[in-house]
């Protein structure tokens, strides 16, 4: 008695092929499938196999046999296709454990041409065939064959062929591959059709148009127990991408002092015109203090740089490289560099001047005007009209000495009002008396002497 995967009652023999003397159906060759498809064409709608090896001529090898199950596709290079002992045989209703033996066959898929003209080879897809069927129907279990991986249930006898009929795509659709609980899927591979509702819906729509018998088979397929092996492709691919980028998918990356210092140093190592200020490297560290020659940026924008929420709308006004070079006035100026003890090198400045013109029809015009008015010459507004050039912080010892000096200056000390008063206060010599008498006789009062001092 031959078993038919997906059917609870496997007692009926399949008529999809002629039976040989040993009770095993003959192989259904690629030519047989092509002829059958051509004969069915005059019925109005040609039956197409579902989830089978490719039937189109391509640069890869053509698989002339239809697997009972959907394939397993490789999506990550460098990974080996393998299962642990006793695992890897797809489960299907109607197949006893003793018949769960066979092999996975690697199908090398076609290559395609990329937009830049290069040929790229698609990663292979693997299909399962029961022992004694498929491309290597005559092989003995365990034979070393390139592109073949043998699997069997622990209760199966691998010395005899599996009594399983080969699939006729016009009568049986491929069964979505499912494994027994505890099966570990090879890393870097995913099951075709796993976790998707589209194949089920398409199967349902086809079963409605094919009559009650096919609907019964379709419903029996849907009653298969769900496998614990359900790889979520979205999570796997996201994890691979994050790992490639050096990020942890589990936790958000925290910015430490060390990482912020590294980011800041990386920015400052770039040429001045290539720097992008942000929270880790503020505007003034990148481009210096605000003043007449660098007059844009309020206090908040100076801290955040391009991370400021208002900056993106300003970036819409920034010229493109083409507009910068072809729409500006440029002048190349040679500058002196270094001191007497430094090596001489030629330094040039590409000085430019230009204008960016826009009008009230520009999207976000009012917001742009508001942000510009808040940040243009903001250094003057915040300092009451005085240029903001922050003095260098004084050291503690120098500041204490300055405070002590101020205290001494605050002490009141009597001081003479003029040098003449200081001269009057001292004792006069005979020469001074003679000179003073002569001046008084002439009636001339020297500066600084008045009646109160006489």
From Swiss-Prot:
Location relative to the cell: Virion; Host endoplasmic reticulum-Golgi intermediate compartment; Host Golgi apparatus
Family: Belongs to the betacoronavirus nucleocapsid protein family.
Residues where Phosphothreonine is found: 177, 429
MF GO annotations: RNA binding
Organism (species): Rat coronavirus (strain NJ) (RCV-NJ)
Region described as RNA-binding: spans on this chain: 56-197
Modified residue annotations for Phosphoserine: 170, 194, 390, 425
Protein name (record): Nucleoprotein
Protein residues bound to RNA: 109, 125, 167
Entry PTM: ADP-ribosylated. The ADP-ribosylation is retained in the virion during infection. Phosphorylated on serine and threonine residues.
Keyword list, A-Z: ADP-ribosylation, Host Golgi apparatus, Phosphoprotein, Ribonucleoprotein, RNA-binding, Transcription, Transcription regulation, Viral nucleoprotein, Virion
Role of this protein: Packages the positive strand viral genome RNA into a helical ribonucleocapsid (RNP) and plays a fundamental role during virion assembly through its interactions with the viral genome and membrane protein M. Plays an important role in enhancing the efficiency of subgenomic viral RNA transcription as well as viral replication.
Any single Gene Ontology cellular-component annotation: viral nucleocapsid
Oligomer and partners: Homooligomer. Both monomeric and oligomeric forms interact with RNA. Interacts with protein M. Interacts with NSP3; this interaction serves to tether the genome to the newly translated replicase-transcriptase complex at a very early stage of infection.
InterPro entries assigned: N_prot_C_CoV, N_prot_N_CoV, NCAP_bCoV, Nucleocap_CoV, Nucleocapsid_C, Nucleocapsid_N
Biased composition (Polar residues): 49-61
Location of the region described as Dimerization in the Swiss-Prot/TrEMBL record: 267-384
Composition bias type Low complexity, residue spans: 11-21, 193-227
Pfam families: CoV_nucleocap
Domain CoV N NTD, residue spans: 64-193
HAMAP family: BETA_CORONA_NCAP
Region annotation Disordered: where it falls in the sequence: 1-62, 186-230, 271-292, 385-428
């Amino acid at each position: 008695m031959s078993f038919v995967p997906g059917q609870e009652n496997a007692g009926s023999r399949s008529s999809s092929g002629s039976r040989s003397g040993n009770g095993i159906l003959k192989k259904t060759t690629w030519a047989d499938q092509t002829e059958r498809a051509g004969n069915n064409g005059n019925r109005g709608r040609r039956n197409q196999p579902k989830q089978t090896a490719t039937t189109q001529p391509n640069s890869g090898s053509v698989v002339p046999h239809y697997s009972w199950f959907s394939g397993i596709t490789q999506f990550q290079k460098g990974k080996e296709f393998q299962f642990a002992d006793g695992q890897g045989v797809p489960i299907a209703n109607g197949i006893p454990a003793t018949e769960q033996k066979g092999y996975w066959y690697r199908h090398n898929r076609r290559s395609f041409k990329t937009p830049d003209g290069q040929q790229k080879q698609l990663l292979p897809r693997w299909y399962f065939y029961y022992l004694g069927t498929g491309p290597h129907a005559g092989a003995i279990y365990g034979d070393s064959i390139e592109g073949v991986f043998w699997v069997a249930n622990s209760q199966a006898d691998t010395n005899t062929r599996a009594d399983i009929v080969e699939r006729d795509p016009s009568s049986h659709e491929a069964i979505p591959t499912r494994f027994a609980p505890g099966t570990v899927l090879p890393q870097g591979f995913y099951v075709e059709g796993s976790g998707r509702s589209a194949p089920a819906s398409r199967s349902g729509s086809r079963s409605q148009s094919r009559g009650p018998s096919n609907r019964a088979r379709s419903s029996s397929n849907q009653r298969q127990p769900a496998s614990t092996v359900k790889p979520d492709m979205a999570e796997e691919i996201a994890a691979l991408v994050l790992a490639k980028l050096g990020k942890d998918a589990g936790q958000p990356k925290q910015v430490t002092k060390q990482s912020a210092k590294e980011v800041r140093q990386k920015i400052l190592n770039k040429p001045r015109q290539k720097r992008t200020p942000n929270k880790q490297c503020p505007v003034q560290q990148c481009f210096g203090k605000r003043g007449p020659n660098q007059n844009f940026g309020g206090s908040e924008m100076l801290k955040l740089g391009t991370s400021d929420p208002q900056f993106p709308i300003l970036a819409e006004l920034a010229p493109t490289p083409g507009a910068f070079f072809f729409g500006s006035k440029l002048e190349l100026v040679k500058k002196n560099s270094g001191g007497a003890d430094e090596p001489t090198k030629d330094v040039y400045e590409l000085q430019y001047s230009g204008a960016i013109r826009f009008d009230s029809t520009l999207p976000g015009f009012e917001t742009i005007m508001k942000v510009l008015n808040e940040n243009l010459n903001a250094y003057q507004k915040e300092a009451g009209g005085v240029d903001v050039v922050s003095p260098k912080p004084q050291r503690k010892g120098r500041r204490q000495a300055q405070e002590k000096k101020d205290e001494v200056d605050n002490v009141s000390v009597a001081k003479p009002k003029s040098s003449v008063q200081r001269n009057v206060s001292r004792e006069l010599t005979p020469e001074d008396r003679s000179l003073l008498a002569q001046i008084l006789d002439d009636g001339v009062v020297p500066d600084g002497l008045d009646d109160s001092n006489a």
